[in-house]
Design a protein with these regions (language model features):
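Intrinsically disordered, low-complexity regulatory segments in ankyrin-centric signaling systems
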Residues: 1-29, 34-41, 45-53, 57, ...
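Ankyrin-repeat-protein effector appendages
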Residues: 1-10, 102, 136, 145-148, ...
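Ankyrin-repeat boundary/"N-cap" motif
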Residues: 4-10, 36-42, 69-84, 109-115, ...
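Ankyrin-repeat intra-repeat helix-capping/turn positions
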Residues: 17, 51, 90-91, 124-125, ...
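Conserved ankyrin/ankyrin-like repeat signature
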Residues: 21, 54-55, 94-95, 128-129, ...
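Ankyrin repeat domain, specifically the short helix-to-loop turn at the C-terminus of the second helix
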Residues: 23-31, 57-65, 97-105, 131-139, ...
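Alpha-helical adaptor scaffolds
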Residues: 72, 76-80, 84-97, 101-102, ...
Length: 173
C-alpha cells in the first residue's frame, strides 16, 4: 500500500469510526497519527469534527498531538486544533471531554483568531460544552483577534443559554 492509499484509508477509517481498521493502520505506521492529509487536516481534528469518540481515543492512545494546529488548505476551514474542529463539527460532548482530559488547551487561537470558547459561543447553545471549556481553564473574558469576548459572539448569534452561562462566568471572575 502506498502512502496516498494509507492516508485515504486512515481518513476514511477516522471519519466512519472504524476503530479496528484505524488501530491496524496506526500499529503498522505510528507516524500516521500526526500526518496531515492533502488538505492540511490532521486525523485527530478530522475524527473530532465528525464526533468519532472511538477514533479520537485510538488516535490519542497512539500519540496524536492533542494541541497540534492543522494547516488547512480549504478556504472555509481555518487552521485549528482538534478542539476547535470538535466545536465546529458534531459538537460531541464525549469527544470534547476526551480532548480536554488529554490536555487540549482552551487558549490556542485558530487561524481566524478564535479561542475554543469563542468557537463554542459561535456554533452552539449547548451549556454542557461551555461549562466543560470553563472547567478546563477557558477564560470567559479573553478577546479574539477582533476584540470580542465569547459573550459578544453568543449574543450576536442569539445563543441565549450560552450567553447566560458566560455572563455568570464573567461575574464570578
Amino acid at each position: 500500500m502506498n502512502h496516498a492509499e494509507q492516508m485515504n484509508d486512515l481518513f476514511q477509517a477516522v471519519q466512519e469510526g472504524h476503530v479496528e481498521k484505524l488501530k491496524s493502520l496506526l500499529d503498522a505506521d505510528p507516524e500516521l497519527a500526526n500526518t496531515e492529509n492533502q488538505d492540511g487536516l490532521t486525523p485527530l481534528g478530522y475524527a473530532s469534527h465528525y464526533g468519532q469518540a472511538g477514533a479520537v481515543r485510538v488516535l490519542l492512545e497512539h500519540g496524536a498531538e492533542v494541541n497540534a494546529l492543522s494547516h488547512s488548505k480549504i478556504s472555509y476551514i481555518p487552521s485549528n486544533t482538534a478542539l476547535h474542529a470538535a466545536l465546529a463539527g458534531e459538537r460531541s460532548p464525549e469527544v470534547i471531554r476526551l480532548l480536554l482530559e488529554h490536555g487540549a488547551s482552551t487558549s490556542i487561537l485558530d487561524s481566524d483568531g478564535q479561542h475554543a470558547l469563542h468557537s463554542a459561543a459561535f456554533h452552539t447553545d449547548q451549556i454542557e460544552l461551555i461549562e466543560m471549556l470553563l472547567q478546563h481553564g477557558a477564560d470567559p473574558s479573553a478577546l479574539n483577534s477582533s476584540g470580542q469576548t465569547a459573550l459578544d459572539i453568543a449574543l450576536e448569534r442569539g445563543n441565549t443559554s450560552t450567553a447566560s452561562c458566560l455572563r455568570a462566568a464573567v461575574a464570578a471572575q
